Amino acid sequence: MKIQNPMSIYEKLNILSDAAKYDVACTSSGTKRKGDGSGMGNCTQCGICHSFSADGRCISLLKILFTNECIFDCKYCVNRRSNDVVRTSFTPDEVCTLTMEFYRRNYIEGLFLSSGILVSPDYTMELICATLYKLRKECNFQGYIHVKAIPGASQELIQKAGFLADRMSVNLELPTAEGLKLLAPHKSRKNILAPMRLIQEG
């Protein structure tokens, strides 16, 4: 693992928006063209993507991971434990700051938040819940939030996040138990399907 000096929030944003691009949720242009200073506008690679609201509108979302650290070593994942990449994590305050500042500038209409597994599924889900609570209750953010449920986290934490988010989903890693055992031996089919059922039941 590459060790870095303390990072700025912008450096974290570059890493954790890039790490989120593999999370299925929405589409993005993928352009990296920067403004030359002679006009207006700037297409940076930081994770603004597009999704569709219930009424069919195309909306812009800040798409980030809370952390790219992970205790698992899934063979297909760029954030797997054994991959030698720069690791970092946001704090709940940093996610709130980014979301609110992007929203005030009319860059986004909402947030897409996923995460690697830091320490444990429950610990990670607690951090996500703390972030969503702060956004909704302290920052009074009423925009759209799509959050990924963390497989293996407790039912109570998943329900808590569900009350604060507009949409929840779970990454279905592989279609068969055999494939999951081969490519993601630390994960279980039961832990993936349990939050999916919970979300489906509302």
Spans of features found by a protein language model:
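Short acidic, glycine/Ser/Thr-rich loop/turn "cap" segments at secondary-structure junctions
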Residues: 79-85, 111-121, 145, 180
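Conserved, mostly hydrophobic/aromatic
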Residues: 61, 74, 113, 170
